[in-house]
């Protein structure tokens, strides 16, 4: 089976500083794949290279069988590879509806109204605040809005970059329940997280990134079963 996302030998960084050192990673259709690692491991750099925000220095990125290694980020979005960035990045002076509608600017524009309604079904709280400015919402509500905006583009693969960052334990529980629900509906998810325990509970497979290299790839159960791996890379 050809992976939905197939990353091979990816290298990248900033200026003269190499961050990614030959990363191999794949996500199959309908999978949740957890990408774990500490701050500075290279997780966000990998996301940005895959999504075309910071071009890769070397290696390849194939999505749906198409080489997108050097593609413009707009073409990557049109292909259905959508990232919800770390820190939510909502537009604070725009309303909830306006933020959502921007999510379909490049892809699925003709189904904007239907997709707004779909997001409101998933996140009823957003319907209640449809005319509210995003900057006046709580952190949890902004995270709902950021994910909803990503869903507006009808992604084939949704990359969630540190979605639990700054949320209360209760909201983190709600978030991971939502991710599982999206997966049950058939959406492939690349979950980039420092919340190791809950990520491994819902993931089909996991990667551990350290200093820009993959130190582990496999089943969550295998990662948790190895005392050495857990201590060295997860702090468990």
Q: What is each model feature region?
A:
Residues 2-236:
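Glycine-rich phosphate-binding loops of nucleotide-dependent enzymes
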């Amino acid at each position: 089976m050809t992976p939905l996302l197939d990353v091979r030998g990816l290298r990248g960084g900033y200026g003269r500083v190499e961050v990614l050192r030959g990363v191999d990673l794949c996500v199959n259709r309908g999978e949740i794949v957890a990408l774990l690692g500490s701050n500075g491991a290279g997780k966000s750099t990998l996301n940005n290279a895959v999504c075309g925000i910071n071009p890769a220095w070397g290696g390849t990125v194939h999505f749906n069988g198409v080489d997108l290694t050097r593609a413009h980020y707009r073409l990557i979005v049109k292909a259905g590879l959508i990232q919800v960035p770390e820190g939510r990045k909502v537009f604070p002076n725009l309303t909830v509806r306006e933020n959502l509608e921007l999510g379909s600017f490049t892809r699925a524009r003709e189904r904007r109204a239907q997709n707004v309604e779909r997001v409101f079904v998933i996140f009823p709280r957003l319907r209640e605040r449809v005319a509210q400015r995003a900057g006046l919402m709580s952190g949890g509500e902004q995270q709902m809005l950021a994910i909803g905006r990503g869903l507006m583009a009808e992604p084939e693969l949704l990359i969630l970059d540190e979605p639990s960052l700054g949320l209360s334990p209760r909201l983190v529980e709600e978030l991971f329940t939502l991710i599982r629900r999206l997966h049950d509906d058939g959406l492939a998810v690349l979950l980039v997280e420092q919340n190791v325990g809950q990520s491994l509970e819902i993931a089909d497979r996991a990667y551990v990134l350290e200093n820009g290299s993959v130190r582990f790839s496999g089943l969550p159960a295998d990662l948790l079963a190895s005392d050495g791996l857990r201590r060295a890379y997860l702090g468990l």
